[in-house]
């Protein structure tokens, strides 16, 4: 009887071992390195830092279908993060044409170059965003994302710009965002949104001549404050930035009643890739041990 039981255990163990071995052999090997994406040179109009991004949250928000309130805030957060260092630079002042409008964002051709650069970077990470139609792209047309340079804005409540555009020093109101915008929950987003109110343009502004222009400049100053946060610490702030962008740019409420999405709606957020890598790494260690548990059990039974 004991001999028969031993033979049965050996047979079961051999079958389990062959199954585990075959699964391990067919499992694809994941590379440890992330392919680098070429960064735009100084001479090109659009300079995005996309060398090490894996665009956490974009697939969840945009991969299946295009929904403005779900997809656009995540896309905008990653585009602002990639453009952050360039946006905060103050180039040497150049003579501007008399016909130029200081309230305008980056020129359309330049914005399109940024869109093309971002889309190419997304494709290298196997992320394909659906296009609304043949004449409308997801980023510029559908989401309406526009990039600005700090030198094109007048945000005295947010940045002190020295004469000659040599330095842009963040005000206390902007530095306060570091404390108020660390939590991406509904309550944290609401706190951050309240702190951003202090960056709005008050009264007259030398770069705006209409009430509509002042409102647009106020929103752009708030977006530049969020851009400064992303330049300071993208990993810590990009989830909250995407939540706040949803309230500022894609909320169904009127502009003066911007509200963050309740936690119950479970809206997707932009998440730094490192967080995904850490969680995957910890779980992969666990799953790597699981296939060998049946073998350990067989050996234990055999020794009884």
Swiss-Prot record:
- Covalent lipid attachment of type GPI-anchor amidated serine occurs at 282
As recorded, the propeptide runs across 283-304
Residue positions the entry lists as glycosylated = 133, 160, 183, 233
Keywords attached to this entry: Cell membrane, Glycoprotein, GPI-anchor, Lipoprotein, Membrane, Signal
Q: Where is this region: Disordered?
A: 91-111
Cellular location of this protein? Cell membrane
The protein's predominant localisation is: membrane
Signal peptide, first to last residue: 1-22
UniProt keyword Membrane present: yes
Source species, domain of life: Eukaryota
Q: Which GO terms describe its cellular component?
A: plasma membrane; side of membrane
Topology in the membrane?
Answer: Lipid-anchor; GPI-anchor
| PANTHER family, per database record | GPI-ANCHORED PROTEIN, OS07G0557700 PROTEIN
Instruction: From the Swiss-Prot or TrEMBL record, give the protein name.
Output: Uncharacterized GPI-anchored protein At4g28100
